[in-house]
Curated annotation (Swiss-Prot):
Transmembrane segments: none annotated. It is found in: Nucleus speckle; Cytoplasm; Nucleus. GO terms for cellular component: cytoplasm; nuclear speck; nucleus. Acetylation of Lys-130 contributes to its nuclear localization and enhances its interaction with KPNB1. Deacetylated by HDAC3. Its main location: nucleus. GO terms for molecular function: calmodulin binding; DNA-binding transcription activator activity, RNA polymerase II-specific; RNA polymerase II cis-regulatory region sequence-specific DNA binding. InterPro entries: HMG_box_dom, HMG_box_dom_sf, SRY, SRY-related_HMG-box_TF-like. One of its GO terms (biological process) is cell differentiation. Keywords: Acetylation, Activator, Calmodulin-binding, Cytoplasm, Differentiation, DNA-binding, Nucleus, Repressor, Sexual differentiation, Transcription, Transcription regulation. This is Sex-determining region Y protein. It comes from Cervus nippon. The gene is SRY. Belongs to the SRY family.
Length: 229
């Protein structure tokens, strides 16, 4: 058993004889690419886009809170950064104008230095990445599908006779048969005589019976259609 394991161990010379190209590529990572290894060890960023970003000049509150934040963090190591920010904002509001004046003067000095150093500076805030929409849980999606299926009421056609399933369809079909559609009413809305309407009446039942051969020509036997309420 130990002999088999020892046979699998190869020296670098044997690896070079079997696959000299692979050995050369592996060795070049440590010899020819020293600059990349140095950057990884030192943590330098290869991209130069971050170096082009210019920070905004500090305002009076930031000048004051920079030192105050450190003291609060040292005094309360368990306090979160958000809680520290709330406390600093509360303390800053309680300061008088005389106490804030030195920090406003320092902020004005930093602003003048910033303008001299970056004359064409314009504040361009970074765009925040859009958060991905949370997916609905599987249970809610199933309930939506069930609700959609329940609203569909099927009925079938058989040899020119309408056979409906469900009391709702039967009641609505009986009501729809009594409703009439008149062509002359749409052609002339202001027609005063209702005597000529009887000649142009077309009931819904006759329209359904006229459409039965079309459904029978599509598929022999029974064909099922779904109506949504």
């Amino acid at each position: 058993m130990f002999r088999v394991l020892n046979d699998d161990v190869y020296s670098p010379a044997e690896i070079q004889q079997q696959n000299p190209l692979a050995f050369g590529k592996a060795s070049s990572l440590f010899t020819d690419n020293r600059s990349a290894n140095d950057q990884c060890e030192t943590g330098e960023n290869v991209r130069e886009s971050g170096q082009d970003h210019v920070k905004r000049p500090m305002n009076a509150f930031i000048v004051w809170s920079r030192e105050r934040r450190r003291k609060v963090a040292l005094e309360n190591p368990q306090m979160q950064n958000s809680e520290i920010s709330k406390q600093l904002g509360y303390e800053w509001k309680r300061l008088t104008d005389a106490e804030k004046r030195p920090f406003f003067e320092e902020a004005q000095r930093l602003l003048a230095v910033h303008r001299d150093k970056y004359p064409g500076y314009k504040y361009r805030p970074r765009r925040k990445t859009k958060r991905q929409q949370k997916l609905l849980p599987a249970d809610s999606s199933k309930q939506c599908k069930q609700m959609h299926i329940e609203t569909l009421q099927p009925f079938t056609y058989r040899y020119g006779c309408a056979n409906t399933t469900g009391s709702r369809m039967e009641s609505q079909l009986s009501l729809s048969q009594s409703v009439t559609i008149t062509n002359s009413f749409f052609q002339n809305e202001h027609h005063s005589s209702w005597t000529n309407l009887g000649h142009n009446r077309v009931t819904l039942a006759t329209q359904i019976s006229a459409d039965f051969p079309f459904y029978q020509s599509l598929q022999p036997g029974l064909s099922c259609a779904y109506f949504q309420y």
